[in-house]
């Protein structure tokens, strides 16, 4: 998300992907940053209708990156999700002096917490100790809708994950994209991918904000 770093990457011919930390959620912001990058990771808070509207504007207005090609949309498809608004969380920086916007998030939100009333110090009854830790994102069951919305690059969690996790998740989503392109994406295949994805580490799954 550093303009100087993006400019330098452009000068040496390095492809740039705009991070979700930029919180790009509308066409005007995208048009500004398109001069630096060929791929944009839109804000995680967008639903597929909003993503599709941005995609339509990319095509309509011919919004292109440094390579002269239409800028491609990248979206999170699987894995851990931040509990905060994209690019706006400073919890890790405040507590550990490690900035999430510099790729150094210490995931303070994943820890277990007890909640106390500030005045009385009475502990509140909270169902789950992990009060800031959301479930993991899984989109393979509506991958076809993401493709239809204009998503062309799928972002899979890999940081701090073991090789088996990375291999299996990548394999499943690669098969799903191939099935979509070949016209063979169906519920039977989705059920198989779902079962395989549940074998590796997860915190339970949800659809993110995509389906509204």
Give each language-model segment a name.
Residues 15-17, 31-34, 39-212:
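Surface-exposed amphipathic alpha-helical tracts and adjacent flexible/coil segments at the periphery
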Residues 1-32:
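N-terminal active-site wall of soluble small-molecule enzyme domains
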């Amino acid at each position: 998300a550093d303009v100087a770093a993006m400019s330098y990457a452009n000068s040496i011919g390095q492809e740039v992907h705009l991070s979700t930390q930029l919180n790009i959620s509308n066409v005007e912001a995208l048009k500004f940053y398109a001069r630096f990058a060929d791929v944009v990771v839109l804000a995680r808070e967008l639903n597929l209708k909003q993503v599709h509207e941005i995609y339509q504007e990319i095509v309509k207005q011919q919004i292109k990156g440094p390579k002269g090609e239409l800028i491609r949309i990248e979206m999170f498809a699987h894995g851990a999700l931040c509990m905060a608004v994209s690019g706006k969380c400073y919890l890790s920086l405040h507590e550990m002096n490690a900035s999430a916007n510099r790729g150094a998030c210490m995931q303070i939100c994943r820890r277990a917490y007890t909640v106390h009333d500030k005045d009385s110090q009475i502990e509140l009854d909270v169902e789950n100790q992990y009060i800031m830790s959301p479930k993991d994102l899984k989109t393979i069951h509506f991958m076809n809708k993401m493709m239809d919305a204009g998503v062309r690059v799928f972002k899979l969690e890999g940081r701090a994950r073991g090789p088996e996790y990375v291999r299996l998740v990548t394999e499943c989503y690669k098969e799903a994209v191939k099935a979509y392109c070949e016209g063979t994406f169906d519920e039977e295949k989705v059920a198989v991918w779902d079962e395989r994805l549940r074998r590796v580490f997860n915190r339970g799954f949800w659809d993110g904000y995509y389906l509204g």
